[in-house]
Structures are given as structure tokens and as C-alpha cells.
Swiss-Prot record:
Catalyzes the reversible conversion of 3-phosphohydroxypyruvate to phosphoserine and of 3-hydroxy-2-oxo-4-phosphonooxybutanoate to phosphohydroxythreonine. SUPFAM superfamilies: PLP-dependent transferases. It comes from the Bacteria. The modification N6-(pyridoxal phosphate)lysine is found at residue 194. Keywords: Amino-acid biosynthesis, Aminotransferase, Cytoplasm, Pyridoxal phosphate, Pyridoxine biosynthesis, Serine biosynthesis, Transferase. The gene is serC. Pfam families: Aminotran_5. Binds 1 pyridoxal phosphate per subunit. This is Phosphoserine aminotransferase. Belongs to the class-V pyridoxal-phosphate-dependent aminotransferase family. SerC subfamily. It is found in: Cytoplasm. Pyridoxal 5'-phosphate binds at residues 101, 151, 170, 193, 235-236. It comes from Laribacter hongkongensis (strain HLHK9). It catalyses: O-phospho-L-serine + 2-oxoglutarate = 3-phosphooxypyruvate + L-glutamate; 4-(phosphooxy)-L-threonine + 2-oxoglutarate = (R)-3-hydroxy-2-oxo-4-phosphooxybutanoate + L-glutamate. L-glutamate binds at residue 41.
């Protein structure tokens, strides 16, 4: 039986990447060492690190005036690092809240300043994104923060917001899933465990002119400039996670880049949403059509009892990790870059059969 893992994260990795890592596990390129054993300052790992950054820059066409940082601490650490580094003498910043992770981000940021909510989708139950014409930004804000894709609610921005201040985006769950104009952002960050690689690595892309103005008392490890000046080698980096991310970047390049993966993601999500919408109400997706996520697809059935049966039977059929987040319930299929089209086809076939038996 073929197994398909629909986990929201840590998520599945491309099979080609796993096989390559398996081949090189005990002997990387004839070095006699596993990447896990290498000195992070040795020439072998330095070449791995350099290629990973070069490939990422090529994939996203990152301008030269942006630094790429390979950090630790997960996206949670960025909820503090962003205000510590980007308030830059100001006392306030704006946050757009479209779900759980936006709420967590502003709660943490309020430890460091007067953070305002410029817009929120809470009134609609976080099932959509308020039109930007209704936002109330502060022109004196240090930055504007938003989450491009909310994994729990399945709400994804179909546009890059206009902003007169540095734009900060948490792209943890849709990084590299579609082309993005990096030059429109002051800072992008992403935890690795959804579209980049295994857990333990956090990527930051930051414009150089925003560096070097941290809040007084900022810990050294939370200073972007310290890491930028040391080329992400201020302390021992998560070497194996960087190596794995590099393999994922190579896999993306070999499979049409971000434009190619965007087309496949649209095809996968389109099939799944069509199945939901054409089920005569047996399955329901609560998210507004125009901002439905192509990464995380939440849906409900008529009763919680039926939802539990769906998840249990899917698990027995090799369709794993479909239970919705504990805060909202229901069912959620996470179909990140590495999910093959065959996995979504298997899921929709199961959905059709389940609806036939229980409809």
C-alpha cells in the first residue's frame, strides 16, 4: 500500500531528495564523512552552504542588496526577532491578522512595542482576508507584518499587500510554492519544516539597510546583523538541515523552478477543491473562494462523528495526518510542494467512496 502523508508540518519531503540523502548518508561525495559529522567551517560543508544559498537566490531571483540567513529557533523566534531588529527607533508597527499565526505573532511582538492591528479577519471567523481598501495602516509604523498562508484556517493571500513601510512576511507554509517579488519586502522568514526541509532550520531574507539598529538589550543571537556579518556561521548552524534544504532547492530547479511548482500546486489544489465543491454539501470548505490556500485545505463533514470516521478510515487506507488542527477540528489536507499529484488523486478517490457509503 502506498502511503501519503498530509501532515501540516513537519511535512513530507520529495522522494528524490530522500533517496539522494540516503545515498550520501555515510559518505558525502567521497569525503568519508556524513554531513552530520562535518565541521561547519570545513571546506566540505562551506561548499554545501554556499550552493544552498546560491540555488535559493536563483530560484527566487533575490536581489544583491538582500542577505540570506540560515538560522535556528523556528518561526516562533522571528516573532521576537522582527520587532527587536526592525522597530529601529520607533515604538509601533502594524499587523494584519488573518488567523492563528498572525495572532501569535502580534502577541509576542507586543512585548517590545505598541503593535497595532491594521486589519483582521476575525469578524468572519478568519475565513477570508479583508479588502486592502478597508485596512487602517499607520504611516508612521516601523513595518507591516502579515502571514501569507495560515496553515490552520487555510487562508492564503492571493496578492502582495501595498505598503508604504517595510513589509514583513511570515511565509513559513507557502515559501517557494509560487514566484514572489522579493524586492517588495523588507524581510521574509520561513520555518523549514513545510516546504524547505526538516525541522530545525529557519530561513530569513532581509534587506541590508534594515540591519544594525536593534533594540537596546537585544541578545547577540537575536541580532540579524551579527548573523549576516558571519554568513550565518556566528554559532554552529543546523548543518544537516541546511544540507537537506539545499537538496530541496536542487530538486526544485530540476523540476521547473518555482513557476513549475506553482502550476503543479494549482492543479493539485484545484482537483481537491473541485471534489469538495461538487459533493452536494457532503464536504464543505468554509474559506472564501478567492483566498483558499493551495497548501492547506480544510474541510468539514456533517458531524464530528463522521469526521472522526473519515480520518480513521483514511489512515487505514494509507492517507495519513488528515485530522484538522485541535483548535478548529474538522479535516485538513496539507498538500505542500512535495505532495505528488498521485497523492491528491488517491485522496479524492477515497473521498468519493466515503461519500458514497455515508452520504
Amino acid at each position: 500500500m502506498t502511503i501519503y502523508n498530509f501532515s501540516a508540518g513537519p511535512a513530507l519531503l520529495p522522494q528524490d531528495v530522500l533517496r539522494e540523502a540516503q545515498r550520501e548518508l555515510t559518505d558525502w561525495h567521497g569525503s568519508g564523512m556524513s554531513v552530520m559529522e562535518m565541521s561547519h567551517r570545513g571546506r566540505e560543508f562551506m561548499s554545501i552552504h554556499a550552493r544552498a544559498e546560491a540555488d535559493l537566490r536563483e530560484l527566487l531571483q533575490i536581489p544583491d542588496n538582500y542577505r540570506v540567513l540560515f538560522l535556528q529557533g523556528g518561526a516562533h523566534s522571528q516573532f521576537s526577532m522582527v520587532p527587536m531588529n526592525l522597530l529601529r527607533g520607533k515604538t509601533t508597527a502594524d499587523y494584519v491578522i488573518t488567523g492563528h499565526w498572525g495572532k501569535v505573532a502580534i502577541k509576542e511582538a507586543r512585548c517590545y512595542g505598541d503593535m497595532r492591528i491594521a486589519a483582521t479577519g476575525e469578524a468572519s471567523g478568519f475565513n477570508g482576508i479583508p479588502p486592502q481598501s478597508e485596512w487602517q495602516p499607520n504611516p508612521d509604523a516601523a513595518y507591516l507584518h502579515y502571514v501569507s498562508n495560515e496553515t490552520i484556517g487555510g487562508v492564503q493571500f492571493p496578492f502582495i499587500p501595498e505598503s508604504g513601510v517595510p513589509l514583513v512576511c511570515d511565509m513559513s507554509s507557502d515559501f517557494l510554492s509560487r514566484p514572489v517579488d522579493v524586492s517588495r519586502f523588507g524581510l521574509i522568514f520561513a520555518g523549514a519544516q513545510k516546504n524547505i526541509g526538516p525541522a530545525g532550520l529557519t530561513l530569513v531574507i532581509v534587506r541590508e539597510d534594515l540591519l544594525g539598529q536593534t533594540l537596546p538589550g537585544t541578545p547577540t543571537m537575536f541580532d540579524y546583523k551579527i548573523h549576516a556579518d558571519a554568513d550565518s556561521m556566528y554559532n554552529t548552524p543546523p548543518t544537516y538541515a541546511i544540507y537537506m534544504a539545499g537538496l530541496v532547492f536542487q530538486w526544485l530547479k530540476d523540476n521547473g523552478g518555482v513557476r513549475g511548482i506553482q502550476m503543479r500546486n494549482e492543479e493539485k489544489a484545484g482537483l481537491l477543491y473541485h471534489t469538495i465543491d461538487s459533493s452536494d454539501g457532503f464536504y464543505r470548505c468554509p474559506v472564501d473562494v478567492e483566498c483558499r490556500s493551495r497548501m492547506n485545505v480544510p474541510f468539514r463533514l456533517r458531524t464530528e462523528v463522521l469526521e472522526k470516521r473519515f480520518v480513521d478510515e483514511a489512515d487505514m487506507a494509507g492517507l495519513l495526518q488528515l485530522k484538522g488542527h485541535r483548535s478548529v477540528g474538522g479535516v485538513r489536507a496539507s498538500i505542500y510542494n512535495a505532495m505528488p499529484f498521485e497523492g491528491v488523486k488517491a485522496l479524492v478517490a477515497f473521498m468519493a467512496e466515503f461519500a458514497r457509503r455515508h452520504g
